[in-house]
A protein has these predicted regions:
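Short beta-strand elements in bilobed, periplasmic/extracellular small-molecule ligand-binding domains
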Residues: 1-17
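A structural micro-motif
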Residues: 3-4, 57, 78
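Hydrophobic alpha-helical
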Residues: 12-66
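Flexible loop/hinge segments that line or gate small-molecule binding clefts
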Residues: 65-74
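Short beta-strand elements at the ligand-binding edges of bilobed clamshell
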Residues: 74-86
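Hinge/cleft segment of the Venus flytrap/periplasmic-binding protein
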Residues: 84-127
Length: 127
C-alpha cells in the first residue's frame, strides 16, 4: 500500500527466506527506497537482507537485542528505538498492586520514555 512517499508493507511470514523474497520484490518494484522502518524487533532479518543485497538505505528498528546490536555495529542498522521493557513491566505491576491493595484508579494512559540508539551510543546503553 503506497501513500504519497510512504510504502507500507506487512510481512506475515517471519522466516528469513520469506522476508528476503518479499523485500527483493519490493526493492525491484520500488528502486527509490531510501529509508526502511521495521516496527518490531525482527529488524535483524531485514538487516541481513540489506547487508547481503548491498542496499544503500537508512534502516530503523526496535529493541536492544544482541542480533540487532551486531548489525548496528556493522553499520547496517542506523537507529534502534528502545522501550525499556523492565520499566514497562514494573509500571504495570505497580499499577495493578496499587489498584488491588489501595483501590487506586488505574491510569488509562501512562507515557513511558524511549531511547534512540545509534552505533555511537549503543555501547553505553543500559536497558
Amino acid at each position: 500500500k503506497k501513500t504519497d512517499n510512504i510504502l507500507k508493507i506487512d510481512i506475515r511470514d517471519t522466516d528469513l527466506k520469506s522476508i528476503e523474497k518479499c523485500l527483493n520484490n519490493i526493492f525491484t518494484e520500488h528502486k527509490d527506497i531510501r529509508i526502511v522502518f521495521v516496527t518490531n524487533s525482527r529488524v535483524s532479518k531485514v538487516a541481513h537482507f540489506i547487508d547481503s543485497s548491498k542496499k544503500d538505505v537508512i534502516l530503523i528498528g526496535y529493541d536492544f537485542l544482541k542480533e540487532n546490536i551486531e548489525y548496528m555495529d556493522k553499520g547496517i542498522i542506523d537507529f534502534l528505538v528502545c522501550q525499556k521493557p523492565k520499566q514497562q513491566g514494573y509500571r504495570g505491576l505497580i499499577s495493578l498492586y496499587q489498584h488491588l491493595a489501595f483501590s487506586s484508579p488505574v491510569e488509562k494512559i501512562y507515557f513511558m520514555p524511549i531511547d534512540i540508539l545509534t552505533k555511537e551510543n549503543s555501547a553505553f546503553y543500559r536497558n
